Amino acid sequence: MEQIEFLILKNLIHNEKYLRKSIPFIKSEYFEDSHQKMVYEEIFSFVEKYNELPTKEVLSIEVEKRDDINEDSFKSVTHLISCLDESPVENEWLVDTTEKWCRDRAIYLALLDSIMMKEVLTNTMVF
C-alpha cells in the first residue's frame, strides 16, 4: 500500500486541479519523513514563486541548492523525487483523503505540543 504522503507529493507535481485545491491546507510539518518534508518545501516554494507545477527536474535542482542537506540525504531526496511518477487517482477521493490527513496531523501535532508544554511546566515548577 502506498503512503498518503507519497501520493500527495506525486499529485502536487502532476495534478494541477489537486494542487490548487489542497496546497493552501498542507503544511510542511505534517510530513513526518524529513525527505518528504524537503520535497514538499521545494514544491511549495516553487508554486508560491512561479504559480506553476514544478517538474521533477526543477525539484532536483532546487534540492541541490540547499545548504541544510548532507550527501546521503541528498541522494535519498533525489531518489524520492525520481519516484514521483504520475499515477491516475480519483481527484475527489484524493482531496477528501488529503483533508483527513491534514486534520489528523494537525490534531496529532497539537496534542504533542500540549504534552510537551505540560512536561516543561511540570519540570520548571518549584514547590
Predicted features by range, described:
Residues M1-W101:
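Noncatalytic partner-interaction/assembly domains of nucleic-acid and motor enzyme complexes
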Residues S82-F127:
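Interdomain "pre-motor" coupling segment immediately N-terminal to P-loop NTPase/helicase cores
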